[in-house]
Amino acid sequence: MDKIAITTGDPNGIGAEITIKALNELDLPQDKIVLISNKDVLDYYGKLDKKYDIIEIPFDKRDIKVGKVTKEAGEFSFQSLLKVCEIKPKAIVTAPVAKNAMYLAGHNFNGQTEVLQKYLAHDNQLAEMLFVANNFRVLLLTRHCALKDVYLTKEIILKKITNLVKTFNNHFNIPNPRFALCGFNPHSGEDGILGREEIDILIPAVKELQALGVDISMPLPADTLFVKAGNHYFKGEKDDYDCYIANYHDQGLIPIKTVAGDKTVNMTIGLDIIRTSPGHGTAFDIAGQNIADPNGMISAIRAVL
């Protein structure tokens, strides 16, 4: 399908509201967009200025429980993702879902990325999380796991960085991207005094990547790296690096969200179809009040135009 498919996320959160606001703001041609949603859910949260195609996901409007985590909402979220995988659109944009709602519905995935990995990946493809705010980009080497369970090997790093190079070549049209690798430990381990992950895992991976022609730094202290990245972002300057490689979730997300806020876009790479999503959650606390800021959704849609 040669359209951008947009899911509206958890029907009890802000997903439908920000989708409606974003599409009305962007004023895109009707033949470019297909919504994976439910007309009753859309009508509950607002009015679209254009009649975009809608692929209906069953949902009883009596099950809309604004701001609540429910099994019915989790099932709707999951079925929306299944449908978008089935139709294989040009690109995918997903509004936020509640992981605990999907768990209540019996779908034990730690996020939308993991669902896409299961139903879209083939031939050993790996879905990766790349966060983007203009030219400030962060790749996560690990995703939704407890900090004590963060697990890295040289082989994992080699595969993820190789996939990242392909994305920069094909999607961003950057033929020779420059990457900065964050150290795993404080001060990049201080020559093994504060941990050996740099010596045993990261540095061997970097040497092998460099031998393949990848422009990637040795492990560098993350705090210093991200201070410089933030300064470049605020000044609108070209960054020293095309992407920063973070070892675990919060190492990468705290800095980019601190400087870019809701304009941060979550991009799934490594599959045949690029998927983007706002860098925020369901915002149950403000759902149904018509006060949700659509800028994150606008950025997510623009990223795949």
Language model features: what each stretch is:
Residues 33, 113, 127-128, 136-139:
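Small-molecule pocket liners
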Residues 1-114, 155-247, 251-265, 271-274, ...:
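Contiguous, glycine/small-aliphatic-enriched amphipathic segments in soluble metabolic enzymes
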